[in-house]
């Protein structure tokens, strides 16, 4: 015979019983109150059943009965209880342990109330930790000078794409990652060495080392890791020549150029060499550096530095002077403008050389000529205005000099923005006009078999 136990919970008392066929009451039921609102039926352990009824048989598949909320009225004997249970109870699988003999349901874990203030403080602490990690990561990214690093990387990639020799995806990926890391390492060392000087310039006051987000020692450690990994990737994934160029660029920019910035105006020419090395790295990844096309690309990047930087430094020349940087913009303003124009004009023969040495087609001269002319126009206006400003007629007239200087500032800004767009335009056009780039469009029409 199957035996199940029934526990009825009331506001006054309780009763234990066995239901189904041969129902037998184990405990007293007379104390059940009429206002019972909840009935819970549980299977009791074998020991509990035997304590009250030695002949009872333990049910190995216990069932939990959960009552509805309807009240039980007029319960007076065993039969009444049995009938009421049949009418009001439904059966569900027991989710409790079959050895349970507790009369009250319980949770298998301790419930501890959490104070609202403590919870808010914990949430604030977690958010603060997350914010600190984010700020630290942003600071290290800023150490690499992301915009400058991207420009360096793109110049290497464009040079690699213009190489007449076949390229591979693996080699391109290693070149991209390695060049990016080497550039980031050089910039991090530069920032680590100049916090006292950068603090005096509005343009550089927000750098991470200046505001204390990263210490100089941390910047140097970061640069060492980036530089080591970058040169290793270039050495193993590309070739030793590219790795040597990457390492030399780190030393040239972070030590020689950075030191010369406070000693002599020649630092600008040294810095231009730094910009010319990435195209050589891209070319050397797939082709020998004996090809004259590689030096045309390097010369293009070298010449571009002067109209770009000289016009930029012109408008912040006083900041450079106050910070102790020796720049042509304030040491010799007329020379600064003349050099910007001179190297803008040099773009024409360098672009011509790309077509002459079969790197691009001859149509490239039309496109690049328009872009070069646009840059030269603003560089020329900048130079002519500065030449007028420092003439004997204007230089000694304070009012006219200030008016002329304001005009020169406008031309310098326009020349600077022209240079920002000039370099990507010239490189992209070179890729589009690469020699034999579009021959596949005419292959079918030139094939006599298909005519």
From Swiss-Prot:
PROSITE patterns: UBIA (PS00943). Keywords: Heme biosynthesis, Membrane, Mitochondrion, Transferase, Transit peptide, Transmembrane, Transmembrane helix. GO terms for cellular component: mitochondrial membrane. GO terms for biological process: heme A biosynthetic process. The keyword S-adenosyl-L-methionine does not apply. It comes from the Eukaryota. InterPro entries: Protohaem_IX_farnesylTrfase, Protohaem_IX_farnesylTrfase_mt, UbiA_prenyltransferase, UbiA_prenylTrfase_CS, UbiA_sf. The chain crosses the membrane at residues 149-169, 240-260, 265-285, 289-309, 339-359, 414-434. Its EC number is 2.5.1.-. GO terms for molecular function: protoheme IX farnesyltransferase activity. The keyword Mitochondrion applies. Pfam families: UbiA. It is found in: Mitochondrion membrane. It is a multi-pass membrane protein. Belongs to the UbiA prenyltransferase family. NCBIfam families: cyoE_ctaB. Converts protoheme IX and farnesyl diphosphate to heme O. This is Protoheme IX farnesyltransferase, mitochondrial. The gene is COX10.
